[in-house]
């Protein structure tokens, strides 16, 4: 699948997807097992984020070929198309901040 500029922008439009992609530019980490734990001892917001990651954001990045995701091992690695989005990730304002929150000149 050839990714378009619109695809790249969609991939980084959400803060959770953007943070995942930025983390992969620094190294090829494993996704934290605790992040996908839905136990009642976790704050509701954390459980909601984990559910969103599992059911929305990670599948979207997989479909784009940007990541490889082993659900059983809760492991995320760079996908076959990852190198194509790296130039965009490199120029994001503040690198880890919201695009609209960055106040740099």
Model-based region annotation:
Residues 30-46:
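Short acidic, hydrophobic short linear motifs in intrinsically disordered regions
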Residues 57, 79:
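Residues in the recognition helix of alpha-helical DNA-binding motifs
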Residues 1-27, 32:
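Short alpha-helical segments that sit at the start of domains
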Residues 58, 62-72:
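A short, conserved structural fragment
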Residues 71-76, 82:
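Short, Lys/Arg-rich nucleic-acid/phosphate-binding segment
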Residues 83-105:
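Short, amphipathic alpha-helical interaction segments positioned at domain boundaries
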């Amino acid at each position: 699948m050839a990714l378009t500029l619109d695809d790249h922008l969609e991939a980084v439009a959400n803060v959770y997807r953007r943070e995942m992609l930025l983390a992969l530019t620094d190294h090829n980490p494993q996704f934290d097992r605790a992040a996908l734990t839905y136990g009642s001892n976790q704050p509701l917001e954390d459980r909601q984020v984990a559910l969103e990651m599992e059911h929305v954001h990670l599948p979207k990045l997989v479909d784009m070929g940007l990541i490889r995701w082993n659900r059983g091992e809760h492991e995320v690695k760079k996908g076959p198309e990852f190198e194509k989005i790296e130039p965009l990730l490199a120029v994001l304002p503040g690198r880890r901040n919201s695009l609209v929150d960055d106040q740099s000149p």
